[in-house]
From Swiss-Prot:
Name of the gene encoding the protein in the UniProt record: GRXC5
Protein name: Glutaredoxin-C5
Ranges spanned by the short sequence motif Responsive for interaction with TGA factors, renumbered to the chain: 132-135
Alphabetized Pfam families for the sequence: Glutaredoxin (PF00462)
UniProt cross-references to SUPFAM superfamilies, sorted A to Z: Thioredoxin-like
InterPro entries assigned to the protein according to its UniProt record, in alphabetical order: GlrX-like_pln_2 (IPR011905), Glutaredoxin (IPR002109), Thioredoxin-like_sf (IPR036249)
């Protein structure tokens, strides 16, 4: 098993079982924070939600391509929904918590906040500052 011994010495090597343990140790709130910081624009969504579809279409119409995390397709999606509901102050109502948008790693909020920012003209500067929009 020379390959196994050599691979174990490498700093980048992590066996699949260790990766699962590391992922399980990450709380839902930590996962939300990590995912929110991985792209300029991140949308936490439910695939059957019309408001989620509307916010995704808004960004695509502006030429912004957000990272979309469909919570209903994620095995840990329920936990993420609860963490997001706490973040946006939905009082534990997970259904009221989506879509949740992060721009530049910062919480913008749910659909009402995104649309308010779009209408009052503050959404485009946020997108430019995050590097999601160049024009």
């Amino acid at each position: 098993m020379q390959y196994g011994a050599a691979a174990a010495e490498q700093a980048w090597y992590m066996p699949a079982a260790a990766m699962v343990v590391a992922a399980a140790a990450e709380t839902a709130a930590e996962r939300v924070e990590r995912l929110a910081s991985e792209s300029a624009v991140v949308v936490f969504s439910v695939s059957s939600c019309c408001m989620c579809h509307a916010v995704k279409r808004l960004f695509c119409g502006m030429g912004v391509h957000p990272a979309v995390h469909e919570l209903d397709l994620d095995p840990r999606g329920r936990d993420l929904e609860r963490a997001l509901a706490r973040l946006v102050g939905a009082g534990g109502a997970a259904a009221a918590a989506v879509p949740v948008v992060f721009i530049g790693g910062k919480l913008v909020g749910a659909m009402d906040r995104v649309m308010a920012a779009h209408i009052n003209g503050s959404l485009v500067p946020l997108l430019k500052e995050a590097g999601a929009l160049w024009l």
